[in-house]
Amino acid sequence: MRMTLRLFMAKQEPNFEVLAGAGGVALGEARTNHEGRKAILLIRGQEDTTEFESLIKTMGIVIVESIYQPGEQDPKGYFGKGRLQDVSDELRLRVAGHPWQGVDLVLIHTNATPRQLVAVSDATKVEVWDRVRLLLSLFNAHANSLEARTQVRIARLQSDRTVLRELANQTTTGERAGYGGGGVTALQAVIANVNRELTSLRKRQKKHSKAQAERRRQRTRSGAVTVGFAGYTNAGKSSLFLKMSGKEVLVEDKLFSTLETTVGRLAASPRVLLADTIGFIDNLPSATLDAFRATLSEALECDLLVVLVDATDPVREFERKISATQREINARYLNQDELENLDERKIMCALTKIESLTTEQLAEKKSIVKRHGYPSPLAISVHQEIGLEQFQDAMLKQLFGKTVTIKLLNSEAGRSIEGYLSDVYESGMIINKQLEKNGDILVEVWINQQSLARLVSNSNGRIEVK
């Protein structure tokens, strides 16, 4: 199916046939439900398609056939001209009874160049997605909030603009005929419209980013500390977030079910906040991921960063994903000083979904994690509630150091001791409390130094640090 791009102008409405799947520059609602669509997959060489096929499965798209061509990809059309023509001829024969009947999508197993996308679209006459466009369609399907929709729209428009520029370039050089009588001038008008929308969306995103930053500053001033969950997509971040905070988030065994950041409180403490955000994926162009910069900042600009890794992945995938996660974390810091001080940041690692692993398999995964710079990886299972108490204690120790013992002094004059105890509950996480014979209360608590100092200074001498 070809997609038509319509440029609305004051006195004319010329139509442009644009690369199928461009999506972002098409007027109206973009398609979000691709369940049941049929596609063919083009692959060069002996590339591993496991992750790509997982993304396709998440979309509900059915791969009718995978077509391989040996050797390096052709810079002009991904497949060689002859092989691409064979695919095109076969697509034209997809009548009733043909194995490709109902195919309306061609998938390319690469981050294709605009030239390759245009060439495959021209040859096949159906919608074409490369890896980036597959991800953008997946993002679009999962974007539920205004923040997420804005981010996805920016990423789609940036991708579409590169294709429009390629079309304009080919029209200028005579490689293709002009569109609708408008030629390059009309395409340039479309690109100008895209640029204007991008400018507007970025202003909206910048405003949202400033609001997020102000909320983070307010939380810091109030004495709250933040734990950010980071990791490869589908590593179990949202499941752990739900378990630790009790705050509802979408939890699915699907890639990229989370696109925006959700902040909630650690269930046992009002002063520890948890941030769950979008997962990473390997080989996603920086320009695309940059559209989600504000969302990522909410989790990465934290007091403690927790890197989560799916322990059920085969060893090779496990290593690839933890390497990709480290690479993306390093790339997301806002300035060079943060990157240089990365080793000084509070950071820990946890292996998730360990319930199906043997002791030997878990030991091997821990060894790999240690080689990547995490000396004491934890092992947890949200589903079977394995290791969660140790995980929480490790987080609190990283944030606050050792627990603090304080004494609340009983007195008949002034404020009640229960009132001061309530202040302690609001400021930290009480591990143990003991009522003494004279009415004093001994409390063991996780608490940061700022909150502790505020408690003592506001207690009129009724709170002592032991």
Task: Name each region found by the language model.
Residues 18-30, 50-53, 72-92, 278-301, ...:
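Switch II of P-loop NTPase G domains
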Residues 41-44, 66-69, 107-109, 307-310, ...:
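Conserved beta-strand segments of the P-loop GTPase G domain that flank and frequently precede/overlap
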Residues 3-38, 161-235, 241-242, 332-466:
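C-terminal-of-GTPase-core extension/linker across diverse P-loop GTPases
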Residues 1-137:
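N-terminal accessory targeting/assembly segments
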Residues 219-225, 243-270, 281-294:
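Switch I (effector-binding) loop of TRAFAC-class P-loop GTPase G-domains
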Residues 134-152:
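Short alpha-helix plus adjacent loop in nuclease-associated cores
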Residues 53-55, 91-100, 111-126, 269, ...:
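Conserved C-terminal guanine-recognition region of P-loop GTPase G domains, centered on the G4
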Residues 46-47, 71-72, 111-114, 133-137, ...:
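Conserved nucleotide-binding/hydrolysis micro-motifs of P-loop NTPases
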